[in-house]
């Protein structure tokens, strides 16, 4: 994927310029997925964290959620995985608008189509879940989000839904 600055979402683009002024060393550009293209597992979160991937340019790094998910991956001894977000840029207050989520669907499709051995997609949070089932033309009304649910996306790929590993969800004992 390309590291160029995206201007497709005007609100996010403006917000990233403000963040760049405050934190000149931050990445403040689209954050693309990373990991093995031979992976059978792909993990989708919501969006880069302000002081995480938005800072480093690498998904799930430098913040609470990143540290937690990477500890879990290490504990599970996963050698090959791919990790990304359904929204590529940090949205204001970490709340992407519908148009911003939809603007990234092309990138979600592109990243997934590069993973030829993919068997399982894990979504962290309901927003990621909704975007992925939408990508596979599955109706939310018939497949509502539920932590731990498994949805067959097609003949070779299953989706597992999980609550997001955010500090809020941990501190409120949601997970």
What are these language model-derived features?
Residues 1-145, 149-153, 157-175:
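A polyanion-binding, active-site-adjacent surface
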């Amino acid at each position: 994927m390309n590291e160029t600055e995206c201007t497709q979402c005007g609100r996010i683009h403006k917000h990233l310029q403000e963040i760049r002024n405050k934190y000149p060393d931050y990445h403040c550009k689209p954050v693309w997925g990373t990991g093995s293209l031979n992976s059978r597992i792909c993990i989708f979160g919501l969006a880069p964290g302000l002081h995480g991937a938005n800072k480093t340019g690498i998904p799930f790094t430098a913040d609470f959620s990143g540290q937690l998910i990477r500890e879990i991956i290490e504990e599970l001894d996963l050698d090959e995985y791919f990790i990304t977000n359904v929204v590529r840029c940090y949205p204001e207050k970490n709340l992407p608008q519908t148009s911003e989520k939809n603007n990234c669907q092309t990138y979600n499709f592109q990243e997934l189509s590069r993973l030829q051995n993919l068997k399982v997609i894990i979504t962290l949070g309901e927003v990621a879940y909704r975007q992925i089932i939408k990508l596979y033309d599955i109706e939310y009304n018939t497949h509502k989000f539920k932590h731990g649910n498994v949805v067959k996306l097609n003949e070779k790929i299953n989706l597992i839904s999980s609550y997001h590993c955010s500090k809020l969800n941990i501190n409120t004992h949601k997970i």
